[in-house]
Amino acid sequence: MRASSVSVLIAVTSAMFLGCTLTRAPASPEGADGSATGSADAGAGGDAAGPNTIDVKCPTLAMPTGSATAYVDGRSAGSEDGSKASPFRTLAKALATAPPNGVVWVAAGSYRENLVAPDKGLTIVGGFTPGFASRTDACATVVEAADAKKPVITAPAGVEGLGLDGLTVQKGSRGLQAESDGGPTQGTFTIANAVFADNGTVDGEGGGVSFDRVHGRISGSVFRNNRASKGAAIAAAGDVTLRIEGSTFERNVGHSDHGGALYLGTRSATITRNTFRSNEIGKDVGYGWGGGVILYGNGAQPVKGDLSYNVFTDNLASVGAAVFVDDGASVTMSHDLIFRNRAYRENGVARGAAIYVDGLGGPTEGSTLVADHLTVAFNAYDETGAPAGSSRGGGVYMESYSKATFTNSIFWKNGEEPLFGDPTCALDVRYSIAPSSCGGGAACSVGAGVFEPTEIHFVDEARNDYHEKSTAGHFAGGAWVKDAVTSPAIDKADPAKGGDTEPMPNGGRANLGAYGHTGEASKSP
């Protein structure tokens, strides 16, 4: 589990990439301005859809604002000089002849190649119709490994960057491998509006993307059906920055014991507006931690992470099926929606189906989690997807001198002892719907504003809509629908946190949960 330090920042799309379809997640108070340009908004205010509508298969694409320096169309006949009229037939030839900082446009089609990126700072842009007059979606241009034992795209040591926009990258030992030789940190690799599918091996880390001491920006993309020992979608290590936003991670499988979708040894991390669905860890060994995301420390330096506006559902692990904070990492979470995740049973007990916080071992080496405005619900299922007969720590499970603080959050129906920590841990809960006590002997502080109602009144749990009902109206995809009842979560956040970011009428006080303190908060009656 040890790796050199990484800085991972997952956030806003680079302006040079256009036309992505973002996953839908709880809206931020800041609005939709941080989303990438494209066919779907990721935003706040009154027009962002709820998490029951998350389903992105092929990101849609807009025309770039600039022009190309080389063109590729595998169906081209006759001479090939890389012009629009006589495009190259292979990507390899375009990469070899493109000038520094060149932009390569690629027409729809299937390209069976193993590419080696030159050190030119190139950008490869796919999804074009014949003639390059328009673009369709990222599934139109497919780059598939000719030799499945090699990565589809390799960036050797010394390559200072590469851009990928609007491509499907599939069926290689890795989708993209960018690793340094132990020298100075390399340049930036940018992925936008792409699909990484069916990549990886069971014994290598980072099936979709493997970054070692290179910077990266990933936005509006889809990672599905990738596999690896750890980090089936993405593994990152080294003193780097990595930005990812508005991307979907689904059915990625880790065959070893740490990190189903993301395996990040990071110095700083921000993971925002992504959807993690049906990822798993422990496929071969029968146990593992961090089905969706693991952020782990390395003992050598402070490790910080920030997760916000993400959706986690149906992920599987022994503990921490959604999120695992490990080995001294310090992480914040806000406005994340975590529901119906699964945990392997050990001795008949399913543990920690949502969040797991574990230290490195010593009294000063615990991990730290500070969380605000979470909705953590129905995380009491076993590996088969059936309700667990016995569960423990379904909301949060803590070990080894770790500390966690939760405010303005909702913990609902997460099984027996949903808040659990061993005697070395400290757990603080304030202004939340949560149990009044913790299991496992942890130092448990249940402070002001904590209560546990008999009913929560989510809008529609069966359809995964976790907005709260209100007689004044709940957000419903651009409209406001009035309900017969009002959820007890409305206007129950910390009074010091006003309701100014919520739609009127808002009672002057924010709601609890992932949608509280956003433009999608249910109105106050």
Predicted features, each with a name:
Residues 17-66, 219, 293:
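Ser/Thr-rich, Pro/Gly/Ala-heavy low-complexity intrinsically disordered linkers and tails
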Residues 27, 50-93, 110, 457-460, ...:
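Right-handed parallel beta-helix/beta-solenoid
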Residues 75-79, 102, 109-110, 127-133, ...:
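Acidic glycine-/aspartate-rich tracts in secreted/extracellular proteins
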Residues 92-95, 100-132:
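N-terminal extracellular ligand-recognition/capping segment immediately after the signal peptide
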Residues 113-122, 178, 190, 243, ...:
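Predominantly extracellular beta-rich ligand-binding scaffolds that present long acidic/polar faces
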Residues 122-173, 193, 198-200, 452-463:
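Right-handed parallel beta-helix/beta-spiral solenoid domain characteristic of secreted/periplasmic
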Residues 150, 448-521, 525:
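C-terminal accessory segments
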Residues 159-288:
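Right-handed parallel beta-helix
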